């Protein structure tokens, strides 16, 4: 299809270990909106141990900045492709994972729990880090099996022989999102009625809608040139369906003590004791 421009949002662990504060989330939300206004597909690359959990970040409304970025990336009317290239933990990765298509490199890890919380699970349930990772399910293969990601890329950062796999995914991933939106519009003409209602509200907004738009922190389209087409509406709707599919729900009964899944019984303490005893006996 020839050369195309895309917007890239990436986390870099060599700078501040990839930890984002409120200022990073706010800037990213602005960039995402800017890309969408220019009709540029958005690529997000996740590699972070999590959002900044310290007092200064929370004092600057860290939680709100994360929520705003999630809302902005869910609201854009262009294809969004998310790829986990390394670590993807907690609020640092969740916003960038709000994409039409979510992929993971074969050595990538992803979880909504912060690393410190995982460490608490290790101590609480007497688990080794390997056992904790197994029960929680953070590897790319476990994530795919659980339905939390859409695919695995056969590439590891630093490899040169498989770099074409990564480059191919960038192209085919965006093309598949666009193909899916085109097929959805063709098979569901009712979306045209929905789009027509959107146009009507844009041309003749109600006073209450105008008041809501005036107080919104999301970037709203004000000029006809920037206004999304029907495929932009399809991207948003299909993204919502994809995100809804990844979210798992449970009842209080299933979550409580009567749950069918037993609490894992770790053997970390026993294993450490055996190793220390073996070392002591060999020293004797």
Predicted features by range, described:
Residues 1-15, 25-53:
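A structural preference for short, pocket-lining loop segments at secondary-structure junctions
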Residues 1-6, 10, 15-17, 167-284:
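Intrinsically disordered, low-complexity segments enriched in small/flexible residues
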Residues 18, 50, 88-92, 232, ...:
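Glycine-centered flexibility motif
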Residues 19-22, 56-58:
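Short, solvent-exposed loop/turn segments at secondary-structure boundaries
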Residues 22, 26-29, 90, 137:
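Glycine-rich phosphate-binding loop at the start of an alpha helix
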Residues 46-192:
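Conserved catalytic cores of soluble enzyme domains
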């Amino acid at each position: 299809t020839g050369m195309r421009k895309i917007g890239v949002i990436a986390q870099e662990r060599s700078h501040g270990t990839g930890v984002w504060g409120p200022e990073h989330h706010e800037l990213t939300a602005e960039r995402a909106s800017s890309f969408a206004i220019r009709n540029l597909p958005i690529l997000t690359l996740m590699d972070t141990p999590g959002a900044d959990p310290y007092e200064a970040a929370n004092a600057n409304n860290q939680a709100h900045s994360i929520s705003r970025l999630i809302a902005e990336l869910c609201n854009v009317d262009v294809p969004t492709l998310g790829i986990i290239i390394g670590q993807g933990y907690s609020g640092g990765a969740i916003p960038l994972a709000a994409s039409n298509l979510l992929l993971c490199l074969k050595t990538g890890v992803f979880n909504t729990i912060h690393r410190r919380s995982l460490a608490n699970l290790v101590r609480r349930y007497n688990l080794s880090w390997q056992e904790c990772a197994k029960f929680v399910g953070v590897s790319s293969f476990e994530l795919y099996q659980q339905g939390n990601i859409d695919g695995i890329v056969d590439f590891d950062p630093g490899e040169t022989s498989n770099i074409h796999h990564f480059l191919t995914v960038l192209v085919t991933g965006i093309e598949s999102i666009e193909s899916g939106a085109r097929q959805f519009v063709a098979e569901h003409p009712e979306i045209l009625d929905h789009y027509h209602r959107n146009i009507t509200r844009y041309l003749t907004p109600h006073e209450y809608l105008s008041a809501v738009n005036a107080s919104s922190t999301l970037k709203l389209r004000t000029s006809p040139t920037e206004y999304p087409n029907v495929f932009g509406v399809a991207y948003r709707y299909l993204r919502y369906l994809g995100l809804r599919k990844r979210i798992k729900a449970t009842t209080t009964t299933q979550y409580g003590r009567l749950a069918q899944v037993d609490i894992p019984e770790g053997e970390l303490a026993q294993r450490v004791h055996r190793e220390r005893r073996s070392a002591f006996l060999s020293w004797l």
